[in-house]
UniProtKB/Swiss-Prot annotation:
Listed transmembrane segments: 9-29, 39-60, 68-88, 111-131, 164-184, 205-225, 276-296, 306-326, 396-416, 421-441
An example Gene Ontology molecular-function term: peptide transmembrane transporter activity
Originating organism: Rattus norvegicus
Site for Inter-subunit salt bridge with TAPBP, residues: D17
Keywords on record: Adaptive immunity, ATP-binding, Endoplasmic reticulum, Immunity, Magnesium, Membrane, Metal-binding, Nucleotide-binding, Peptide transport, Protein transport, Translocase, Transmembrane, Transmembrane helix, Transport
Recorded topology in the membrane: Multi-pass membrane protein
Residues bound to ATP: 515-523, 618-624, 678
Cofactor: Mg(2+)
Descriptive protein name: Antigen peptide transporter 1
């Protein structure tokens, strides 16, 4: 059925409903249940709901263009089906007295009239629209609402479902125990007013005390189990989010500032887990309490309970609207907070630079500026919260006054006893409080949704370049080929860094890559490590594209050391063995440290290789960090070693030691080495030199060949050798 055909379907449903009410359903159920008119009313109503519900599902299934508001037909048919049975039951059970059974049967006859039929739709449409609107907490398919987020967060507790079930049982038992005080207070009131002595008074008082104490003990046990379980969820969510971030492609970290990522992994995740562990605890507790109170209220006075429930929509509407405002403000606050965190992170991570430029006050002012930008958002957030709390307080007060007035009228008529009214008022006060707490929790839970959406963005995000390769050959030669490679960084897609780059790196050879700054030398190193994918051409290793290799295998065969390597805030031993799937022996660690020139200064520390290097290795000099990073690469015994100005901070003795290792060690005679450098002494000794200019190879050959050619390489050598003014 096309989208424009929905009016025909709606008219058909109206015709079916009219026929059901006129001759069909009343006639059938008058034969099946002739002696019980109230049961007949319920049978007609439920059958009407079921038949129309199937029709609505059919309309929604074949109508494509108007599904948004047509979804409200489902609560509409429910309202139509339940309205008449609900009215009949209310009139029968209310304090105004039971109807005659004939009156119940007369309701069916009245509802089959045309004017009543139209009136039922007029009355049901607003109720259905409200139902459909409030039902947005559980968002339709394709949209993640707060309920979906909550269910997904609880999905992290799949292995702890038994504990959650136990918590729910303890919660229900504890809530039932809390009903003892209002219940026995009502009974005592009746005894006093009737001037009777109750032989079982003491026994009832003891029973009330026992139930109250048991309720407290059960609540304590439930809270303890709940908090332990939520702590498990907290740890798991943090771990899963951080793991998801680590598996993103390298370009992801260029597009997203480190401060923003850190804020999501730490602060946003903590906000969500805090909401689940604290707010959900309160929500479940007051929900269970409210349901128990509602049951006792119905037992005390069905009429007063209906009056109380009819006032609840007024309490729900405004908080629902404020919750949406609160959620949007929460997202904006989190984004603004991430920006201020990024400013602080940049300043703290570059303190030597900040101090060398005497810009401490400038950074502080910039941070204050970011915080000032958050103030309007915080004010709006606070105003929405205060308005919501004030509205609930006034509504609750009006409800209490109304219940006292109506309850007094029922006592005067003899419909309820004074004790029952006292118990009901106590139940109703606690029930209203439970509703108020639930509504006050709702905006804060909406606030956590703003943060959880960001978290699930990371958990659901598929890397643009997934590490899905599977090649892991037993023997690798280390032959590297760049075939017409082009590349632009993801954060600057219109700036071509490499253009038509073609060259070969041979096993057993040291190839030097030289060229001016910005020519793409470090980009070549990044592509060889499979940190990025070329936008054009291929990067082959032993004839296979790098992306085809298993991620862990590739990085045991390819190792790189940069000019400013980062170390982790761990021991020398852990930094050198970083990333290895096996645990190296101390002899292996010492051997590579000696080859890189790191052993001597490491041995000078009191704790030797167990000494912590500080955050990012900031307790070491640049040369010491390079030596440790070089040892970290050498211990892998890679088939391809990439040195990107990796020895520039080493002293002359250690530089010579590294050169002897690369050129004279039998172990390195068959390995491939790419030496990215601006030092002529290192380039001269290389077996082959590639001169890179504007993202492509300008010329290549040995040092002597390039000097004789008199091209770009020779010009650079002469410029570096020329005395400065």
């Amino acid at each position: 059925m096309a989208a424009h055909a929905w009016p025909t379907a709606a008219l058909l449903l109206l015709l079916v409903d009219w026929l059901l009410l006129r001759p069909v359903l009343p006639g059938i159920f008058s034969l099946l249940v002739p002696e019980v008119p109230l049961l007949r009313v319920w049978a007609v109503g439920l059958s009407r709901w079921a038949i129309l519900g199937l029709g609505v599902r059919g309309v929604l299934g074949v109508t494509a263009g108007a599904r948004g508001w047509l979804a409200a037909l489902q609560p509409l048919v429910a309202a139509l089906g339940l309205a008449l049975p609900g009215l009949a039951s209310f009139r029968k059970l209310s304090a105004w007295g039971a109807l005659r059974e004939g009156d119940n049967a007369g309701l069916l006859h009245w509802n089959s009239r045309l004017d009543a039929f139209v009136l039922s739709y007029v009355a049901a449409l607003p109720a259905a629209a409200l139902w459909h609107k409030l039902g947005g907490f559980w968002a339709p398919s394709g949209h993640k609402g707060a309920g979906d987020m909550l269910c997904r967060m609880l999905g992290f507790l799949d292995s702890k479902k038994g504990r959650l079930h136990l918590v729910l049982v303890l919660l229900i038992l504890s809530c039932l125990g809390e009903m003892a005080i209002p219940f026995f207070t009502g009974r005592i009131t009746d005894w006093i007013l009737q001037d009777k002595t109750a032989p079982s008074f003491a026994r009832n008082m003891w029973l009330m005390c026992i139930l109250t104490i048991a309720s407290t003990v059960l609540e304590f046990a439930g809270d303890g189990i709940y908090n332990i379980t939520m702590g498990h969820m907290h740890s798991r969510v943090h771990g899963e989010v951080f793991r998801a971030v680590l598996h993103q492609e390298t370009g992801f970290f260029l597009k997203n500032p480190t401060g923003s990522i850190t804020s999501r992994v730490t602060e946003d995740t903590s906000n969500v887990c805090e909401s689940i562990s604290d707010k959900l605890n309160l929500f479940l507790w007051y929900l269970g309490r409210g349901l128990c109170l509602l049951a006792f209220m119905i037992w005390g006075s069905f009429y007063l309970t209906v009056v109380t429930l009819l006032s609840l929509p007024l309490l729900f509407l405004l908080p629902r609207r404020l919750g949406k405002v609160y959620q949007s403000l929460a997202v904006k606050v989190q984004e603004s907070l991430a920006k201020s965190t990024q400013v602080a992170l940049e300043a703290l991570s570059a303190m030597p630079t900040v101090r060398s430029f005497a810009n401490e006050e400038g950074e502080a002012q910039k941070f204050r500026q970011k915080l000032e930008e958050m103030k309007p958002l915080n004010k709006k957030e606070a105003l929405a919260y205060v308005t919501e709390v004030w509205t609930m307080s006034v509504s609750g007060m009006l409800l209490k006054v109304g219940i006292l007035y109506l309850g007094g009228q029922l006592v005067v008529r003899g419909a309820v006893s004074s004790g029952n009214l006292v118990s009901f008022v106590l139940y109703q006060l606690q029930f209203t409080r439970a509703v108020e707490v639930l509504l006050s929790i709702y905006p804060s839970m909406q606030k956590s949704v703003g943060a959880s959406e960001k978290i699930f963005e990371y958990l659901d995000r598929t890397p643009c370049s997934p590490l899905s390769g599977s090649l892991a050959p037993l023997n690798m030669k280390g032959l590297v080929k760049f075939q017409d490679v082009s590349f632009a960084y993801p954060n600057h897609p219109n700036v071509q860094v490499l253009q038509g780059l073609t060259f070969t790196l041979y096993p057993g050879k040291v190839t030097a890559l030289v060229g001016p700054n910005g020519s793409g030398k470090s980009t070549v190193a990044a592509l060889l490590q499979n940190l990025y994918q070329p936008t054009g051409g291929k990067v082959l290793l032993d004839g296979e594209p790098l992306v085809q290799y298993d991620h862990h295998y590739l990085h045991t065969q390819v190792a790189a050391v940069g000019q400013e390597p980062l170390l982790f805030g761990r021991s020398f031993r852990e930094n050198i063995a970083y990333g290895l799937t096996r645990t190296p022996t101390m002899e292996e660690i010492t051997a590579v440290a000696m080859e890189s020139g790191a052993h001597d200064f490491i041995s000078g520390f009191p704790q030797g290789y167990d000494t912590e290097v500080g955050e990012t290795g900031n307790q070491l000099s640049g040369g010491q960090r390079q030596a440790v990073a070089l040892a970290r690469a050498l211990i892998r015994k890679p088939r391809l070693l990439i040195l990107d100005d990796a020895t520039s901070a080493l002293d002359a003795g250690n530089q010579l030691r590294v050169q002897r290792l690369l050129y004279e060690s039998p172990e390195w005679a068959s390995r491939t080495v790419l030496l990215i450098t601006q030092q002529l002494s290192l380039a001269e000794r290389a077996h082959h030199i590639l001169f890179l200019k504007e993202g492509s190879v300008c010329e290549q050959g040995t040092h002597l060949q390039l000097m004789e050619r008199g091209g770009c390489y020779r010009s650079m050598v002469e410029a570096l050798a020329a005395p400065s003014d």
